[in-house]
Amino acid sequence: MSWQTYVDDHLMCDIEGTGQHLTSAAIFGTDGTVWAKSASFPEFKPNEIDAIIKEFNEAGQLAPTGLFLGGAKYMVIQGEAGAVIRGKKGAGGICIKKTGQAMVFGIYDEPVAPGQCNMVVERLGDYLLDQGM
């Protein structure tokens, strides 16, 4: 299965039969390379991805400044050090799950709830972890 298929079928999917979808999604390598992304994923700057990688390696780096992706600023909220970063921006937000070799990104806006985004992103991340990825 291609990485693009994971994005299209497992991240940009209908969430629990609600007809709702994430706004955008992507899978990156832990080195910052893009493995696959939705067409709607924001144009990002390399330093934005570098800051996310640094946060996974040294939790607490983004809380004072916020997480930036595609120029949008997300307020960093609770996550799991070294494993999950969650951010909020207005009625939407972001969830990023780190596995051994990948980072799974999900971005949402209303009517999708934070917990729905977290479930979609973390479920794929946990599956990849189980597969040794």
Swiss-Prot record:
Single Gene Ontology MF annotation: actin monomer binding
Matching InterPro entries: PFN (IPR048278), PFN_euk (IPR005455), PFN_sf (IPR036140), Profilin_CS (IPR027310)
CDD domains registered for this protein in UniProt: PROF (cd00148)
SUPFAM superfamilies cross-referenced by the UniProt entry: Profilin (actin-binding protein)
One GO CC term on file: cytoskeleton
Locations listed in the record: Cytoplasm, Cytoskeleton
S-S bridge residues: C95-C117
The keyword Disulfide bond appears for this protein: yes
Gene3D superfamilies per UniProt: Dynein light chain 2a, cytoplasmic
Function recorded in the entry: Binds to actin and affects the structure of the cytoskeleton. At high concentrations, profilin prevents the polymerization of actin, whereas it enhances it at low concentrations. By binding to PIP2, it inhibits the formation of IP3 and DG. Possesses high binding affinity for poly(L-proline).
Similarity field: Belongs to the profilin family.
Protein name: Profilin-1
